[in-house]
UniProtKB/Swiss-Prot annotation:
<dbReference type="InterPro" id="IPR003509">
    <property type="entry name" value="UPF0102_YraN-like"/>
</dbReference>
<dbReference type="InterPro" id="IPR011856">
    <property type="entry name" value="tRNA_endonuc-like_dom_sf"/>
</dbReference>
<feature type="region of interest" description="Disordered">
    <location>
        <begin position="13"/>
        <end position="44"/>
    </location>
</feature>
<dbReference type="Pfam" id="PF02021">
    <property type="entry name" value="UPF0102"/>
</dbReference>
<dbReference type="GO" id="GO:0003676">
    <property type="term" value="F:nucleic acid binding"/>
</dbReference>
<protein>
    <recommendedName>
        <fullName>UPF0102 protein BB4515</fullName>
    </recommendedName>
</protein>
<dbReference type="InterPro" id="IPR011335">
    <property type="entry name" value="Restrct_endonuc-II-like"/>
</dbReference>
<comment type="similarity">
    <text>Belongs to the UPF0102 family.</text>
</comment>
Amino acid sequence: MTDTATRLAFARAAQAQRRLHRRPPASPRARPGARDGGSPTQRRGQAYESAALRWLARQGLRPLARNLRCRAGEIDLAMRDGEVLVLVEVRVRAHAGYGGAAASIGASKQGRLARAAALLLPVLLRRHWPGAPPPVRFDVVAFEAGRPHWLRGAFWLAEHAPAQGRRGQDAQGWRVR
């Protein structure tokens, strides 16, 4: 085989491999709940996010955005509490077993939220904060048995934590109070 023929054979083989591994486009029928606003679980989550948004607004926070998505994950709610940007994770558990809704946000989930926030922060700041970037606080609204529990300041983004009250950082860069 000549050099050109070998390259052509490899190119055809690579093309055939790509064809084999190509996924068919998802049709609306292939995605569960695509036409009716999502699966029952998604609709339930959206209802609790709406309830959390209304509840936090009654507590004095101002809504900025909801369901912010990027490749690193999703931020359920973005709100403003005075001069603090508050990113809210909404969790729901029917029963308090295994620690309940708030306990389901471990170190790995906090890391995903922080990575998503790092990617989404420039857009949020451009839209809602002219000037110096504000402190960024993560709150959790945990619904257990239908009742909201607000964990204010569950964790902070290390580079956007307020100066007062700092006691240091843990191994992942979270502010420890």
